[in-house]
Regions:
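A cross-kingdom feature marking charged/low-complexity
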Residues: 608-636
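Intrinsically disordered, low-complexity domain-flanking/linker segments in eukaryotic proteins
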Residues: 159, 425-443, 667-693
């Protein structure tokens, strides 16, 4: 049928049309199968789609008839494979089981002859570019159908292992391998041909059929089309990438997959040709009512953006397509040098931006748009009920975008980690090395290529602007994000100068400058924590998480004049409503203690008092114990006086809790609950036995006593004996046989097991001498 018959096909029910294609291919005789497939591949009426007109606001997507058609044809072929195999097996019952394999081979041969006939006709040169996509659609369906049938037969075989009746052999694996090779050949030709013709289109040397395809999904406002044969081919490749081994994909040029795949993924979210400006206008249509609740209409710009993203034919394939692009990045990363690989992921083709810069721009625009909207930081109960469906849809799109970005950048980071030199060698800083942003001096460098370090910094900047989404999964995000995040920081941590540069650049983005003097007040450069906006608070949390991992390599001046002034307000303004900012600041300080930074000596009085005041509102019992152990372990190597001062502060807090005489009902309730639960977790806010109700906090006196016992393995020999005396008194202060006493004795024994060689012998003697008294009545 000619192209003019396209409108007639549009009048047919889609299920009837593609169902009929699958039915006839499964039932026709072999010569007719060949003819039918040939017509299917070269049909102008089937593959010429109507013109699509996007709306004027730049956010409404054009229809995607080409992608829809290729996917539907693939599904029809998969159905035909299933039905043909069922027919072959039915005939084998009468003709013998060994005819089934021959019949299936002959049918697949007929399909392949029909697929190939268009490429070998007299007008092959004119037809070749046009038939490659239909050929790929047919092969994709056959591959999916055979793979699905193999899995189904394997499942049935496992279920009928003890059954005497054997299944009719079909040797599907040999047919799958044959189709895989043909599928890869056509995919490589399709992407290569479309790349060449796209270049001709941009250069003005386009023929009639090229212009026709360009118009299919294009628009009149200068946007690149999204419903092109190249993009449709990528959609088919994404559907079948898991069915083809990676080593078979070598004929496909990985740079084409990356160069074409990234813009396609961006187009799902309304980014065409690298133009991200439309993202800046999102979320601004959220409104606040008189009661302070936010609302977002379904027909608003943001609502339509979410709806159109989810209705995009590639939205459901964004995960497989991102993995396809990521695998291509990995393959290129293993063979390219540092400069070539960096160019691959930072410079796009045809003047467009590459993978990392494009994702960075998208993330930055979304970050600013979201953080300035009425939805930022607002829990569900502060959103109008009528808007819940729309905001839920928006969040689904946001999280899909985050997973897509994580998949792509994980491949970049993985390649850098794999190609980094091992072992890492460190060199003194050059005398003429330029200072970093903020005037921080250069630090020792390493033999890791600078382009790799810059690439990792760019990746971290992308996730800085996406942390408002990541943080919904918890302070550390989700598993694949954690792998990417900590792998990046691990490599940067091997280069002290890169650590300083990374923190300096992030600080510059936050608008935080160097504090001119160590004694200056933090408020001169940092907004008070209570007045921080959602954007500031989110960025500070991410900044502190990065600085925590790099703290050991940062110069003392940067720690004292930048990090502490940034995190201290979030420690002082400890609001349970902003737990993330407190926990990230708290973790950074512990990292400074672990690294033995000089500033921790003067910080100790403030920080220890803060810890003792933070239970149970901000810290659990386990967190409090871990923090005190970290502080004492760090101080015991540098200052005996501060170490013992910290121990005395814990003892004073215990004495104050005793003197304060906590309400009897609370104390007795804690004891009765402990007696009723022999496990006695002691962690504030943990899950109860039923998994629903939290376990009430332990009395402060008992939590501090457990922490004191844990300090036994953290002090040096100078204070060891004195601390044992205090722990002994705390044990005897509890009634014999009480659950509280059992917990303190158990924690003491655990701490003694961690003693080093200097204190182990004396600690064991002390335990053997007093353990009968400790456990009396147990």
């Amino acid at each position: 049928s000619p192209a003019s018959s396209t409108d007639h096909l549009e009048l047919m029910d889609r299920n009837n049309l593609y169902g009929a294609i699958g039915y006839y291919l499964s039932a026709l005789s072999l010569p007719n199968v060949t003819d039918f497939v040939h017509v299917l591949v070269v049909s102008a009426s089937l593959w010429t789609a109507p013109r699509a007109h996007p709306s004027d606001d730049g956010l409404t997507y054009a229809a995607h008839p080409l992608m829809t058609r290729t996917t539907s044809v693939a599904q029809a072929l998969a159905f035909a494979v299933s039905e043909r195999i069922a027919l072959i097996l039915k005939n084998a019952e009468a003709r013998g089981p060994y005819t089934a394999q021959r019949d299936l081979r002959d049918w697949i041969d007929a399909l392949l002859v029909g697929i190939d006939r268009g490429s070998r006709s007299s007008d092959a040169d004119a037809l070749l570019p046009r038939v490659l996509l239909p050929q790929l659609a047919v092969l994709t369906g056959v591959l999916q159908g055979l793979s699905s049938e193999r899995q189904e037969r394997a499942r049935k075989h496992a279920a009928q292992r003890d059954d005497a009746k054997e299944m009719v052999p079909l040797h599907l694996q040999s047919h799958i391998q044959r189709i895989q090779l043909e599928w890869v050949r056509v995919l490589a030709a399709m992407l290569h041909t479309w790349d060449e013709h796209s270049a001709q289109l941009r250069g003005g040397a386009a023929g009639r059929w090229e212009r026709q395809y360009w118009r299919l999904g294009g628009s009149d406002d200068g946007h690149a089309p999204t419903d092109t044969p190249g993009n449709a081919a990528l959609a088919l490749a994404a559907q079948s990438a898991d069915l083809v081994p990676g080593e078979l994909l070598r004929p496909v040029r990985d740079e084409l997959i990356v160069g074409m795949g990234v813009p396609v993924l961006a187009s799902i979210y309304g980014v065409y040709g690298g133009d991200t400006r439309a993202l800046s206008r999102l979320f601004a249509d959220a409104q606040l009512d008189a009661s302070g609740k936010a609302s977002l209409a379904a027909d608003s710009r943001t609502g339509r953006w979410a709806q159109q993203a989810q209705s995009h034919p590639l939205y459901a394939l964004s995960g497989p397509l991102a993995r396809l692009v990521a695998d291509a990045v990995r393959r290129k990363g293993l063979v390219l040098g540092a400069l070539s690989f960096t160019e691959l992921v930072t410079r796009g083709s045809s003047g467009q931006r590459g993978l990392v810069p494009l994702l960075a721009d998208m993330a930055q625009r979304l970050d600013r748009a979201w953080s300035s909207s009425a939805l930022a930081g607002r829990p569900t109960e502060e959103i109008e009920g009528s808007s819940h469906a729309t905001t839920r849809q928006v969040w689904q799109v946001n999280k899909t975008l985050l997973f897509t970005v994580t998949t792509l950048l994980d491949a970049v980071v993985e390649c850098v980690v794999e190609r980094c030199p091992s072992p890492t060698t460190t060199y003194p800083p050059a005398r003429d090395a330029p200072a970093h942003e903020g005037g921080w001096p250069s630090q020792p460098t390493s033999n890791i290529p600078d382009v790799y370090l810059a690439l990792l910094r760019d990746v971290l900047h992308v996730f800085l602007h996406l942390y408002w989404i990541t943080s919904t999964f918890g302070l550390d995000g989700f598993e694949s994000y954690r792998k990417l995040f900590y792998s990046s920081l691990d490599v940067l941590g091997r280069d002290p100068d890169a650590c300083t540069g990374t923190v300096a650049q992030l600080a510059q983005q936050l608008g935080v400058d160097r504090i001119p003097d160590a004694s200056a007040e933090a408020s001169t450069s940092v907004h008070a924590a209570r007045d921080a906006s959602f954007l500031e608070r989110t960025h500070v949390v991410y900044f502190l998480l990065v600085a925590e991992q790099l703290a050991a390599e940062l110069p003392d001046a940067m720690v004292e004049r930048l990090l502490l002034p940034v995190c201290r307000p979030y420690l002082e303004y400890a609001d349970p409503a902003f737990q993330d900012s407190f926990e990230s600041a708290h973790s950074l300080v512990l990292a400074l203690y672990t690294a033995g930074k000089n500033c921790t000596l003067s910080l100790t009085p403030f920080y220890v008092n803060l810890l003792l005041q933070s239970y149970p509102q901000l810290l659990t019992a386990t967190q409090l114990e871990t923090a005190l152990c970290t502080v004492v372990a760090s101080l015991s190597e540098r200052s005996d006086s501060l170490t013992w001062w910290t121990v005395e502060q814990v003892q004073d807090a215990i004495n104050a809790a005793v003197l304060a005489r906590l309400p009897a009902s609370s104390e007795e309730a804690g004891s009765s609950r402990a007696e009723g639960d022999a496990s006695g977790s002691g962690v504030a806010g943990g899950d109860g036995p039923g998994g629903d109700a939290p376990v009430p906090s332990m009395p402060l006196r008992e939590v501090l006593a457990l922490s004191m016992a844990a300090l036994i393995s953290r002090v040096n020999l100078v204070h060891f004996r004195s601390l044992l005396v205090k722990v002994k008194a705390l044990i005897f202060a509890q009634p014999e046989g009480s659950p509280a006493r059992e917990r303190i004795v158990s924690r003491t024994f655990e701490a003694l097991a961690d003693l080093n060689a200097a204190t182990r012998e004396e600690g064991m003697k002390w335990w053997l001498e007093h353990s009968p008294e400790f456990t009396r009545g147990a």
